[in-house]
A protein has these predicted regions:
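Zymogen propeptides
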Residues: 2-157, 161-163, 173-174
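Active-site-adjacent helix-turn-beta-strand microarchitecture at beta-sheet edges
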Residues: 70, 132-212, 217
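Short acidic-glycine loop/turn motifs at beta-strand connectors
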Residues: 95-98, 166-172, 203, 228-232
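Short, solvent-exposed aromatic-acidic interface loops
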Residues: 107-111, 178-182, 239-243
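A short, polar/proline- and glycine-enriched secondary-structure boundary/capping micro-motif
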Residues: 112-116, 183-189, 219-220, 245
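Short coil/turn connectors at secondary-structure junctions
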Residues: 127, 160-161, 168-169, 195-196, ...
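Structural recognition of the beta-strand scaffold that forms the well-ordered cores
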Residues: 129-133, 165, 227, 235-237
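Domain-core and long-helix interface of multi-subunit machines
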Residues: 193, 201, 205-245
Length: 245
């Protein structure tokens, strides 16, 4: 599957982190979690940009709605499950229509340290039809955080830290925090910035080697990845881990 990706794909562990959802009316959204919580500020699930955007408060009527497929006037989703090395792998192919876009949502609508909520709970709160975890922002004190056009944290984690930037038009870019500031990304039109990595595929080429990735994959942790295939055509991958099921 990775050889078919024309865009970029980022990989990150799922451990009680941050989630990406497909909202019932407009697009994708994302969540956060972890252990001892500390609230910094309340967070709006609405997108804040200088350009036109589709609000998550709208409504859509599903024309297809099954356990493995969904379609309405803003999105089409197809889900398949595979088993490799005794691990369940879930793959969602998502096509977003019109002005709908990827969106994010924080646990308890709160930006803070280790604010915790189940992915399913946050997904339900924003009327999501598809949800996966995302980055580790709440477990760290640094690393860019932009959610729905709001700049929440501008401190760089590391000059070589790779982030996924999602723009209003749905395009992806992988940046290193040492090359650009969070404010500059916001000025360029970034709507979401997710701090994880490493980048797995860039421009149809594998972008990691054993020194980047293999060591991190040795533990039995859940993993998730998001990639862009072409314009507003995405793949989301989740592998199970740390479970007896």
């Amino acid at each position: 599957m990775s050889n078919k990706l024309k865009g970029k794909s980022l990989r990150k562990a799922l451990t009680l982190a941050y989630s990406i959802l497909l909202v019932g009316s407009s697009g994708l959204a994302v969540l956060d979690t972890l252990f001892i919580s500390k609230s910094y500020t309340k967070f709006s699930n609405e997108t804040t940009t200088t350009s036109q955007s589709t609000s998550s408060s709208g409504t859509s009527t599903a024309t297809v709605n099954t356990a493995t497929a969904y379609e309405d006037d803003t999105k089409v989703i197809a889900i398949e499950t595979y088993e490799r090395n005794s691990t369940q792998i879930h793959v969602a192919i998502v096509t977003i229509k019109g002005d709908a876009s990827i969106k994010t949502a924080l646990a308890d609508e709160t930006y803070g340290r280790n604010v915790k909520a189940k992915t399913s709970t946050t997904a339900q709160s924003v009327n999501a039809v598809l949800a996966v975890n995302g980055d580790y922002y709440g477990a760290r004190d640094a690393g860019y955080v932009i959610r729905n056009g709001q700049l929440l944290r501008s401190d760089s984690q590391d000059a070589n830290q790779e982030d996924l930037v999602i723009y209003q038009d749905g395009s992806f870019e992988i940046i290193r925090e040492g090359d650009i500031t969070a404010q500059e990304l916001l000025n360029k039109g970034a709507v979401q910035v997710l701090t994880f990595g490493p980048a797995l595929i860039e421009n149809s080429q594998v972008a990691v080697d054993s020194t980047d990735e293999v060591g991190k994959a040795m533990a039995s942790n859940p993993r998730t990845a998001i990639g862009v295939i072409d314009d507003k055509h995405y793949v989301l991958v989740v592998s199970d881990g740390r479970t007896d099921e």
